[in-house]
Design a protein with these regions (language model features):
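N-terminal auxiliary segments of SAM/dcSAM-dependent transferases
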Residues: 2-73
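Class I SAM-dependent transferase core
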Residues: 45-111
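Conserved class I S-adenosyl-L-methionine
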Residues: 114-123
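Conserved SAM-binding loop of SAM-dependent methyltransferases across substrates and taxa
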Residues: 124-136
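Conserved SAM-binding motif I beta-strand of class I
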Residues: 139-144
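Conserved SAM-binding strand-loop segment of SAM-dependent methyltransferases
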Residues: 159-172
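A short acidic, Gly/Pro-enriched loop at the edge of an enzyme's catalytic core
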Residues: 173-184
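A short glycine-rich, Lys/Arg-flanked "PGG" loop and its adjoining helix->strand segment in the class I
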Residues: 197-205
């Protein structure tokens, strides 16, 4: 079976996590063997392991994460989704495209009511608030490096009567938790992480 056929099958009939992960490892290993010169991946991994989890976090905060929510209201949609949206037909409004993308993330993450869920890099809370509303018995912990983002999310949660969402303000270099989670989600944050292996070792389920 080709990778395209296997991926199509997995999308039509969701498979258990352990099956998907095993398949992903095989595909990644096969691709690495084709496109990665010998030793390059190991050298890159060693270089990453010597770095902090996140670099230039303070600069990123000064540039945009610490700006007031009113600024982002000028160009983000009603969900304040600070990542890509989804336009299946190209005719969707920004708000509709936000909602469709959020629903896709929820579906692909295999989320369910009653789970302990951790979101790393929650932005302005679009996914966290969506999860909290959709899964009222779930317990959601959201991590952001921005005090304005935390204040905004907590205010929105109060407005919506959501009591199952806790927001933590923390630099990813310092974040650690002893809690166990059923799901860990992160949308468009890992490209900012220099040493993602160190981060995952702190938050693994």
């Amino acid at each position: 079976m080709t990778f395209a056929a296997a991926a199509s099958l997995a999308e039509r009939a969701p498979l258990p996590d352990f099956v998907i992960r095993a398949g992903m490892r095989r595909v990644i290993a096969a691709n690495d063997a084709c496109v990665t010169p010998p030793g390059t991946d190991a050298a890159f991994a060693r270089a990453m392991a010597g770095k902090p989890i996140a670099e230039h976090a303070d600069a990123a905060n000064r540039q945009h994460y610490e700006l007031p929510p009113e600024f982002f209201a000028l160009f983000l949609g009603p969900h304040r989704k600070y990542s890509s949206c989804l336009y299946p037909t190209g005719k969707e409004t920004l708000g509709e495209a936000e909602a469709i993308a959020l629903a896709e993330t929820v579906a692909h993450a295999g989320l369910a009511d009653g789970q302990e869920i951790l979101e790393l890099g929650c932005g302005w809370g679009s996914l966290s608030l969506t999860m909290a509303e959709k899964f009222p018995a779930a317990r959601i912990t959201s991590v952001s490096n921005s005090a304005p983002q935390r204040a905004y999310i907590e205010a929105r949660a109060r407005e919506c009567g959501l009591t199952n969402l806790a927001v933590v303000t923390c630099d990813m270099n310092d974040f650690a938790t002893a809690k166990a989670f059923d799901r860990i989600v992160s949308v468009e944050m890992f490209e900012h992480m220099a040493n993602w292996q160190a981060l995952l070792s702190r938050v693994r389920t």
